[in-house]
């Protein structure tokens, strides 16, 4: 990439610390792992002005990391899109990191901006609030469905995604998902 460009990585999840360590917050967990790869682990998040403390950021010359962790994921679009508007002057590449039921734990998919949101309510909120004017790629971090269940019953799905990650799932995210996410991200921005 040349010229005045910026990578904007946005991790979405539910309010922390209440939902920290849940499958639904795997986007925020992966954001932290990628932050280390980007060499930004020593920097402190700052609240983004005019978001009521619901979005925090770290940035350097070419990268901005946004954490939407102060409100429910399904409502994240309103505050995140206010922040995204600040990057309109750049050739910004937006990537949203989120949990994905339809992808097995340990697997990662980077999907182009024009692809489906697959019924993900956090992505739906971002799409709605941006009015489709901010194209964003989707970095789907697989959490899979509950073992032995193919249910799409909202109560079952909610129980699963709001459940705590097991030690085995955390290990899989660290050893399989994070390297795969890093490879996908570096290919996307090169």
From Swiss-Prot:
Database matches in Gene3D superfamilies: Peptidyl-tRNA hydrolase
KO phenotype (gene knockout): Not essential, it can be deleted.
Entry keyword set: Hydrolase, Mitochondrion, RNA-binding, tRNA-binding
One protein family per Pfam: Pept_tRNA_hydro
EC category name: hydrolase
Catalytic site positions: 24 (proton acceptor)
Organism listed in the record: Saccharomyces cerevisiae (strain ATCC 204508 / S288c)
Disulfide bridge map: none
Subcellular location, principal: mitochondrion
Enzyme Commission numbers on file: 3.1.1.29
Keyword Ubl conjugation tagged: no
Record-level Gene Ontology MF annotations: peptidyl-tRNA hydrolase activity; tRNA binding
Name this protein carries in UniProt: Peptidyl-tRNA hydrolase
Subcellular localization: Mitochondrion
Key word Mitochondrion present: yes
Residues of the site described as Stabilizes the basic form of H active site to accept a proton: 99
